[in-house]
């Protein structure tokens, strides 16, 4: 069971935690209504017919939400991501933390994991803070 949970978490980070970025390729919509919406595809956002509420109304909204450095990180974000970053110390090890300014996970050499915003790995940080893995 634990193996399944770990695989699910890692698989979720590959496409990003924001599932709204992914095109569900819905065949049938309620009332047959389809709208032009934008979804992440590779390094950009592209328009595609979708059911109301799927994807984003504009390419700009999609890019802000689906790429590191921009977007709505309110979905599935751990509160520790917004704590103070770890400080440096002589006996410290490599510590990963979330930088809210750049909306990325960064590594601090010789960091003291005394901060709430300290993660054991970049993947752990990305999963907790909703950062897409590139």
From Swiss-Prot:
Q: Where is the BPTI/Kunitz inhibitor domain?
A: 17-69, 83-129
**What is the protein's name according to its record?**
Thrombin inhibitor savignin
InterPro entries linked to this entry: Kunitz_BPTI, Kunitz_BPTI_sf
GO molecular function ontology, one term from the record: serine-type endopeptidase inhibitor activity
Question: What is this protein's tissue specificity according to the annotation?
Answer: Expressed in salivary glands.
For region Linker, the annotated ranges are 70-82
CDD domains the record matches: Kunitz_ornithodorin_C-like
One Gene Ontology term of the biological-process aspect is: envenomation resulting in negative regulation of voltage-gated potassium channel activity in another organism
Q: Which Pfam families match?
A: Kunitz_BPTI
Q: Where in the cell is it found?
A: Cytoplasmic vesicle, Secretory vesicle; Secreted
* Function comment: Tick salivary thrombin inhibitor that plays an important part in the anti-hemostatic strategy of ticks. Inhibits thrombin-induced platelet aggregation, but has no effect on ADP- or collagen-induced aggregation. Is a competitive, slow-, tight-binding inhibitor of thrombin (Ki=4.89 pM). It requires thrombin fibrinogen-binding exosite for optimal inhibition, as its affinity for thrombin lacking the exosite is much lower (Ki=22.3 nM).
Q: List the disulfide bonds.
A: 21-66, 29-51, 45-62, 81-129, 89-112, 105-125
Q: Where does it mainly reside?
A: cytoplasm
Of the GO CC terms on this record, one is:
transport vesicle
Alphabetical keyword list: Blood coagulation cascade inhibiting toxin, Cytoplasmic vesicle, Disulfide bond, Hemostasis impairing toxin, Platelet aggregation inhibiting toxin, Repeat, Secreted, Signal, Toxin
């Amino acid at each position: 069971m634990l193996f399944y949970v770990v695989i699910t978490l890692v698989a979720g980070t590959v496409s990003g935690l924001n599932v709204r970025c992914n095109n569900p390729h819905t065949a049938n919509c309620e009332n047959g209504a389809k709208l032009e919406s934008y979804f992440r595809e590779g390094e950009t956002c592209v328009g595609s017919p979708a059911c109301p509420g799927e994807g984003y109304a504009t390419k700009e909204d999609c890019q802000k939400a689906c790429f590191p450095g921009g977007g709505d990180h309110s979905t599935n974000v751990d509160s520790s991501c917004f704590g103070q970053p770890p400080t440096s110390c002589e006996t410290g090890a490599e510590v990963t933390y979330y930088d809210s300014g750049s909306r990325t996970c960064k590594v601090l050499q010789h960091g003291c994991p005394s901060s709430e915003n300290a993660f054991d790995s970049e993947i752990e940080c990305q999963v907790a803070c909703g950062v897409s893995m590139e």
